[in-house]
Amino acid sequence: MMLLGASLYLNNTQEVSDEIDTANLYANWKMKYNRRYTNQRDEMYRYKVFTDNLNYIRAFYESPEEATFTLELNQFADMSQQEFAQTYLSLKVPRTAKLNAANSNFQYKGAEVDWTDNKKVKYPAVKNQGSCGSCWAFSAVGALEINTDIELNRKYELSEQDLVDCSGPYDNDGCNGGWMDSAFEYVADNGLAEAKDYPYTAKDGTCKTSVKRPYTHVQGFKDIDSCDELAQTIQERTVAVAVDANPWQFYRSGVLSKCTKNLNHGVVLVGVQADGAWKIRNSWGSSWGEAGHIRLAGGDTCGICAAPSFPILG
């Protein structure tokens, strides 16, 4: 293990010594992420979890199988996989949702598309949902902000908190999870506040009905039926997608290919490489992954083709 700049990073080309001073590594990690625990018992538990996660990453790099991605001890290093899932992977897929069947034969044959690096678009900074299961709101707002710029040449910084607090009648549940299509329905019916008027708090609150909601461009939404249609759609706009993000906890860089199709997290598809790898905008801050993004292997990796959708704007 080595320190790479300010980041605690396990390099897959480096043999990990059994003599690593885990205690010092843990102290450095706590300093970087400003971690303080309430009592000695909690401190001991978090140290054990940190050690377990260190061993997990160590085993990943010691595996003889060649990996296409890298892992690191990031801001989630003191969370067990169960705690991580309970806090961050709370997407609520409606029982009525029609999920697309997996297509293992899909192969992308187009050119690279990257909405994060397009001169026609002012790409918004990656946001952080914090310890609130509001990924669905960030997925919806991300698609709205970027697509409104692409399609209408209008720039907004919209309020995820408006969705968290106010879209309960649309079967969303704030920090306990929700669904992107339901968020689009709410915005179509009610408009959406700007972030400056309804700032994000990372917790459930009472709906502020008196706040102005000047964003009124959503006329509905369109569900995408296949990987082929998803590949066509990303040529013209970004897409809200549902994925399995269980293996994403310690992701640092590269193309991730191993995951299930158990949909538990909402994100935004913002590009596709010429080799078919998908580029995803996440909501765990810009220090996570590749400047807040992750790349997934082409096809229906992590269930990305199961339930994509985008807002219809006007």
From Swiss-Prot:
Role played: May be involved in extracellular digestion.
Keywords of this entry: Disulfide bond, Hydrolase, Protease, Secreted, Signal, Thiol protease, Zymogen
Catalysed reactions listed for this entry: Specificity close to that of papain. As compared to cathepsin B, cathepsin L exhibits higher activity toward protein substrates, but has little activity on Z-Arg-Arg-NHMec, and no peptidyl-dipeptidase activity
CDD domains linked to this entry: Peptidase_C1A
Pfam families on file: Inhibitor_I29, Peptidase_C1
EC code: 3.4.22.15
Protein name, UniProt field: Cathepsin L 1
